[in-house]
Curated annotation (Swiss-Prot):
Residues 63-67 are annotated as: Involved in binding to RB1. Its EC number is 3.1.-.-. Pfam families: Ser_hydrolase. This is Serine hydrolase RBBP9. InterPro entries: AB_hydrolase_fold, Hydrolase_RBBP9/YdeN, RBBP9.
Length: 186
C-alpha cells in the first residue's frame, strides 16, 4: 500500500466552524508542517445529525478518502470513519471517542449508523492501521463501548482517565501517532 499523502479530520456532530472548534484547527496546522503532507478539515454537510447517507458520500467525493488517506475521526466522525472503512480501503483510521451504539439518543438513532451490525472484519481488512484514543471519564460515552471498539478492531489503544470527550484545543498525542504512521520523527 502506498504511503499516506494526507489526513482528513472528520469532526463530531454539532456544527460550528471545524477549523476553530476544539483541536481540529490546531491538528491541521501541525500536520501541515510535515513536508509534502496535506490535512483537510472541512465543514461537513448535515452537521447536527451527521447522517451516514450524507457524510459517507461526502468523504468519498469531496474529501477523497482513499488508500493514501489517514482518516482522523472524532466522536460521530469516528463512527463515520469506521462505517467508511467497511467498504473503502484507507491507509489508517485514528478513532477519537469511538462508540458502538446509538446510546439511546434520538439524534444518534436518526444518523443511520446503528441500523445494522458492525462489519469488524471488513474494517480490519480495508485498513491496515487502526489507532484509538479513549478516556474513561468521557461524559457522553460509556467506557464499555470504547473498549468494545478496541477489542473488535484490535486497535492500538491510547487509554486516558482524564481527557473526557477530547474537546481540548491541542492534541499532541495525536500528532505523535500520525507522525509514527508516516515514519516521521516526532
Amino acid at each position: 500500500m502506498a504511503s499516506p499523502s494526507k489526513a482528513v479530520i472528520v469532526p463530531g456532530n454539532g456544527g460550528g466552524d471545524v477549523t476553530t472548534h476544539g483541536w481540529y484547527g490546531w491538528v491541521k496546522k501541525e500536520l501541515e508542517k510535515i513536508p509534502g503532507f496535506q490535512c483537510l478539515a472541512k465543514n461537513m454537510p448535515d452537521p447536527i445529525t451527521a447522517r451516514e447517507s450524507i457524510w459517507l458520500p461526502f468523504m468519498e467525493t469531496e474529501l477523497h478518502c482513499d488508500e493514501k488517506t489517514i482518516i482522523i475521526g472524532h466522536s460521530s466522525g469516528a463512527i463515520a470513519a469506521m462505517r467508511y472503512a467497511e467498504t473503502h480501503r484507507v491507509y489508517a483510521i485514528v478513532l477519537v471517542s469511538a462508540y458502538t451504539s446509538d446510546l439511546g439518543d434520538e439524534n444518534e438513532r436518526a444518523s443511520g449508523y446503528f441500523t445494522r451490525p458492525w462489519q469488524w472484519e471488513k474494517i480490519k481488512a480495508n485498513c491496515p492501521y487502526i489507532v484509538q484514543f479513549g478516556s474513561t471519564d468521557d461524559p457522553f460515552l460509556p467506557w464499555k463501548e470504547q473498549q468494545e471498539v478496541a477489542d473488535r478492531l484490535e486497535t492500538k489503544l491510547h487509554k486516558f482517565t482524564d481527557c473526557g470527550h477530547f474537546q481540548n484545543t491541542e492534541f499532541h498525542e495525536l500528532i505523535t501517532v500520525v507522525k509514527s504512521l508516516l515514519k516521521v520523527p516526532a
